[in-house]
A protein has these predicted regions:
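Short flexible loop/turn segments that cap and initiate beta-strands
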Residues: 59-87, 207, 690-748
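Secretory targeting signatures
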Residues: 1-30, 56, 203, 330, ...
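Proline/serine/threonine-rich low-complexity linkers at boundaries of modular beta-sandwich domains
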Residues: 25-36, 655-662
Length: 852
């Protein structure tokens, strides 16, 4: 009986399950759908020979992981009867995509899109998976191809006036003057700084400020005073101020204090506007310090944009952490743990790459900072999740395991590097597309046989052996170093430290190209022993310099010495030689910048040290400025074509770049008549942010005059460093014009130079009446941006001249004289008669009185 009940129960359950499954089965029934195919063209009309973007696809999108519709075909009927076909075309998940077409003949083209039958892989829009999308055609689109060119965005020229941040994103041309500085320069790092095409051509100072406003001692810097000739501390050696400066988006970031004390003492990061010197914010990052920066471009189907980070590093229990902070605010965003060791190399989109090679173990590894996030997302959500289109949104405020960033790990040949003393270790160089290694380093005497090799890290060639060579040491009992390398120029350079000679090799084959070069100053051997001096390759030239105080420049293809420059100590203050040391800072806009510094300088500092700018091609001196650089602190940096550097002479930061100006002009307010000389006067003043500092305002209550480029170094040292006022200071040129307010008539008044106070004067004699605008224009210089000012003057007609009688002729004079003479005779006779009559009258009166 119980068996029958069980059988009936099974039947009943089966019926229930069957009935309950009917709606689901019905809802999942496959369908056939005829899509709506579209085609558009941008631009339309289009100029013949120009590209047109065809927007093609269907109106129905796909659901992930179906990435889009496949194998669409674009058919273009040309006016000459021929047909062009674009195939295959695959859409994205929106159902559409773009393809490029370049018409070559004028006339109307007809564009049509064919959509082939295919399956719906993932249910979408109520269409079950497995449904069929029928084949379909778009309507034909008439594409007009014309001879007349189209109007395109004209582009924005580089600024001709003072400019500021932020820069409108439409001004793409300005990318060449808005450079960033992300990390210190050093061995095998490109010394050229793109994005600084207006790098300073004079030492004009924009602003000067102490590391900490209102600071004393090392933070205030300079002479300690109190009757002693010593200076406050500099941070050299080993301690260092202005640590690890970074420039991003027109802001310079740096560590406020020395690194000493690590997390046991207060540590702060400061953000300063590079153009104004204004302190934007100060942040304490759990007593960690700024190490380097990142400007990283993320582009995906969800998001496109640049992320700017300031990165602090720390090591806890042997684990290396990177903490990422927003550059705009200093706010912590996320962290990495277990970051592998290595040298940072910035990839094409700003991603940070690190390579590690283990020649004994026979492997080469690449780590990519971006991959940490993308792999974590795949690990957590799977490879098909749509969140992969975003960068960091769901991981803000978290710590990610950086081991996820290992992009590849490949096997390499064993035994590439011969054994060397353990204290020295093999020298390994990481470049943008290869790793190079040697069996020698500058730490010990080199072996008799020099061993050099290179492995590719380029995509598709990971771990490929490029060369593996040996070379008999031509200078035994000496130290050797792989001093410089350039993939672009195809050369790497070895130097023998003891002799300062160099040899050049082909970077792709290891073949010897040239050498030895001429010897350099013997003191350069000390430079090659240090990590603070290095040779570098730029634009086909090898640049070398150091403790000898001479810049040597060689043709990197031949080893021929092209030119030299001596950084002379003209005052004989330097105890290491007749020249100051040469510390290379960077190259920007074809100009080489370098300065003097020292590992552990004496106190007080030697006087007269310099920062120098040369033409990197010719070696011509462009400018030099009184300056003593730091060895252990932050080196000079450049961004937005502005240099920021710490000067140990007063422990202040100096910003060097082109400054704004203000022009004024005055003319008489009362009306002036034609022909009357008029005095026009005005000023051209430097209004850089530094001129508004109290210390400068008190010395220059009427403002700081703008001066000629050739006077700039001495003038800046006077204004900001309180050197004696230079003699024979030259002003700047001012152009003067007059413009009739009503007619627009233009008169060239001429021009003049300002004097050492910034004032100019011109005497002008108007020749035409009317209401005239007087325009004073300072056209700018290598030091200053231009400025102008206007005033007005009324010129009237001259007053009427008094009438002057016409001189009488001789005849008129004679006639007049005759008339006068005749009148004189008559008057004389009349006078006699009057006298006689008068006398007779008196006589008659007297006679009458006697009779009475």
């Amino acid at each position: 009986m119980w068996k029958i009940k069980i059988a009936w129960l099974i039947i009943l359950l089966s019926v229930v399950l069957l009935i309950s499954s009917i709606p689901t089965a019905m809802s999942q029934q496959v369908r056939k759908v005829t899509p709506y195919v579209f085609v558009g063209a941008i631009p339309n009309p289009v100029h013949v020979g120009d590209e047109v973007l065809l927007h093609v696809g269907i109106t129905l999108y796909t659901a992930w992981p179906q990435s889009g519709w496949k194998n669409l075909k674009v058919i273009i009927e040309r006016p000459d009867g021929k047909v062009d076909t674009i195939y295959p075309v695959n859409t994205d998940t929106t159902g559409g995509t773009g393809v490029l077409y370049r018409p070559t003949i004028v006339g109307t083209h007809y564009v049509q899109v064919y959509f082939p039958e295919q399956k719906v892989e993932v249910a979408v829009l109520g269409i079950p998976a497995g449904s069929i999308m029928n084949e379909a055609w778009s309507e034909k689109l008439a594409l007009i191809v014309q001879e007349e060119p189209l109007e395109y965005w004209p582009g924005i020229p580089l600024p001709s006036e003072y400019w500021s941040r932020p820069v409108n994103s439409q001004f793409r041309e300005w990318a060449c003057i808005t450079g960033n500085w992300l990390a210190p320069k050093g061995y095998y790092i490109d010394m050229n700084c793109p994005g600084n095409d207006e790098a300073p051509e004079t030492p004009h100072i924009l602003w000067a400020r102490p590391l900490v406003k209102g600071g004393m001692g090392a933070l205030g810097g300079g002479l300690a005073g109190g009757g002693i000739p010593w200076d406050f501390e500099y941070g050299d050696a080993y301690e260092g101020f202005f640590g690890q400066p970074v420039v991003i988006g027109g802001v310079v970031y740096f560590n406020r204090y020395k690194a000493d004390g690590s997390t046991r003492v207060e540590q702060e990061v400061v953000a300063v506007d590079i153009r104004t010197g204004e302190e934007l914010w100060i942040r304490s990052w759990n007593r960690t310090r700024l190490a380097f920066g990142q400007v990283f471009y993320w582009s995906s189907f969800n998001y496109h944009g640049v992320f700017a980070y300031l990165i602090a590093t720390r090591t806890v229990a042997g684990v290396t952490y990177w903490d990422f902070y927003e550059a705009s605010t200093g706010r912590w965003v996320f962290s990495y743990s277990n970051v592998p060791a290595g040298t940072n190399i910035y990839g094409p989109k700003g991603e940070i790459l690190r390579y590690n090679v283990n020649v004994a173990g026979g492997w080469l590894m690449k780590w990519n900072s971006t991959r940490v996030v993308t792999q974590r997302r795949i690990q957590e959500y799977g490879p098909t999740d749509s969140r992969r289109g975003s960068w960091i949104r769901e991981y803000m405020g978290t710590t990610l395991d950086a081991r996820l960033g290992i992009e590849w790990n490949v096997t390499i040949p064993r035994g590439l590097t011969e054994a060397v003393p353990p204290a020295a270790g093999p020298a390994t160089v990481y470049l943008e597309d290869r790793v190079m290694g040697t069996n020698f380093s500058r730490a010990v005497l080199a072996p008799k046989t020099l061993h050099m090799w290179a492995l590719s890290t380029a995509p598709g060639k990971e771990g490929k052996l490029l060369f593996n060579i040996t070379w008999t040491n031509p200078r035994p009992d000496a130290r050797w170093h792989l001093e410089a390398a350039s993939v672009k120029d195809g050369v790497f350079v070895l130097v023998c430290l003891e002799t300062t000679e160099k040899w050049g090799f082909d970077i792709n084959t290891g073949r010897l190209l040239w050498g030895p070069t001429e010897k350099q100053d013997y003191k350069d051997a000390w430079s090659y022993s240090s990590g603070y001096f290095w040779d570098f390759i730029y634009n086909g030239k090898l640049y070398s310099g150091g403790c000898g105080g001479t810049v040597y420049v060689y043709d990197v293809k031949t080893g021929k010495r092209l030119w030299t420059y001596d950084l002379v100590d003209r005052y004989h203050e330097w105890t290491f030689g007749n020249n100051w040391f040469v510390y290379f800072a960077f190259v920007a806009d074809g100009k080489l910048y370098f300065y003097n510094g020292e590992h552990s300088p004496n106190n007080p500092l030697a006087r007269g040290s310099l920062m120098v700018c040369l033409d990197a091609e010719t070696g011509e001196e462009i400018w030099k400025l009184n300056f003593f650089g730091t060895c252990w602190g932050g080196k000079p940096v450049i961004g937005d074509s502005i240099i920021v550097a710490l000067n140990l002479y007063d422990m202040r930061l100096y910003a060097i770049g082109k400054g704004p100006t203000a022009t004024t002009v005055q003319a008489p307010e009362s009306a002036q008549s034609i022909g009357t000389p008029v005095l026009i006067k005005g000023t051209v003043m430097d209004i850089s942010p530094g001129t508004r500092e109290t210390s400068v305002l008190l010395r220059f209550p009427n403002g700081v005059p703008a001066v000629a480029d050739e006077c700039m170094a001495d003038w800046m040292q006077y204004v900001y460093m309180q050197f004696p006022r230079p003699a024979n200071v030259k002003g700047v040129w001012v152009k003067l014009d007059a413009i009739n307010v009503y007619t627009g008539e233009y008169l060239d008044i001429g021009g003049t130079h300002t004097d050492e106070t910034g004032m100019f004067t011109v005497a002008w004699t108007p020749t035409k009446e009317g209401l005239w605008k007087i325009l004073a224009t300072f056209p700018g210089s290598k030091s200053y941006w231009p400025s102008y000012a206007e005033t007005a003057i009324v010129v009237t007609a001259p007053p009427p001249s008094p009438e002057i009688p016409t001189p009488a002729t001789l005849a008129q004079v004679t006639a007049l004289q005759t008339t006068v003479e005749t009148l004189m005779i008559a008057l004389t006779a009349l006078l006699v008669i009057v006298i006689i009559i008068g006398a007779y009258s008196i006589y008659s009166i007297l006679k009458f009185k006697k009779q009475t």
